[in-house]
């Protein structure tokens, strides 16, 4: 999940820096240099995510999880939240998807259509997975929206269903938050409306 925070963080920071006038930057830290650094970080983290995540776009809780080797060629097939070795983390997928989408959108605006499409389509693929079972909660008896989120696996803070060896089936506040946020982002984009950013209030304090 830390990787996903970085993916989204770099992409959102790029949007913010892009909105700041050139005159606000110093000679030692010019706008183009800051954007170049942020873009390098965004692409590095997003590329790592794409390379080390199963084809459905939903990651296991850690790319270095000790039990992943027991799953065989786990990257070549959809993640299995009900496996017996390592839990998936849908909250990381919700966070990472938004980072991919925002990066893809930025690159397209810069005229890099093919590169932008790579990240945009990866983000859409993740959202498609999250909007389907087993990740989308469809039971009226469950209060969460996004299933198979992880709190802190090493500390054993997660609920393990009866008869199972690893955690599954639960939601988290950050998972549900970022799930809703990425859906709202896409909704705004599809309607060609201004999408929300964390810095929007600077110019529109009442927004």
Language-model features, listed with the residues they occupy:
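Glycan-recognition and catalytic cores of secretory/periplasmic carbohydrate-active enzymes
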Residues: 1-207
């Amino acid at each position: 999940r830390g990787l996903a925070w970085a993916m989204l963080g770099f992409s959102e920071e790029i949007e913010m820096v892009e909105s700041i006038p050139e005159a606000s930057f110093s000679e030692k830290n010019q706008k183009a240099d800051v954007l170049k650094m942020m873009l390098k970080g965004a692409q590095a983290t997003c590329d790592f995510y794409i390379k080390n995540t199963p084809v459905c776009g939903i990651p296991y809780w850690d790319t270095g999880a000790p039990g992943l080797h027991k799953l065989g060629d786990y990257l070549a097939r959809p993640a299995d939240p009900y496996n017996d070795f390592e839990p998936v983390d849908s909250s990381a997928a919700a966070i990472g998807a938004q980072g991919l989408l925002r990066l893809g959108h930025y690159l397209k605006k810069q005229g890099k259509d093919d590169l932008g499409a790579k990240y945009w389509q990866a983000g859409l693929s993740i959202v498609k997975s999250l909007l389907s079972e087993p990740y989308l909660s469809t039971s009226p008896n469950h209060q969460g929206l996004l299933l198979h989120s992880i709190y802190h696996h090493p500390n054993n803070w997660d609920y393990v269903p009866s008869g199972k060896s690893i955690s599954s089936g639960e939601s988290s506040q950050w998972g549900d938050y970022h799930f809703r946020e990425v859906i709202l982002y896409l909704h705004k984009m599809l309607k060609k409306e201004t999408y929300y950013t964390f810095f929007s209030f600077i110019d529109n304090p009442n927004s």
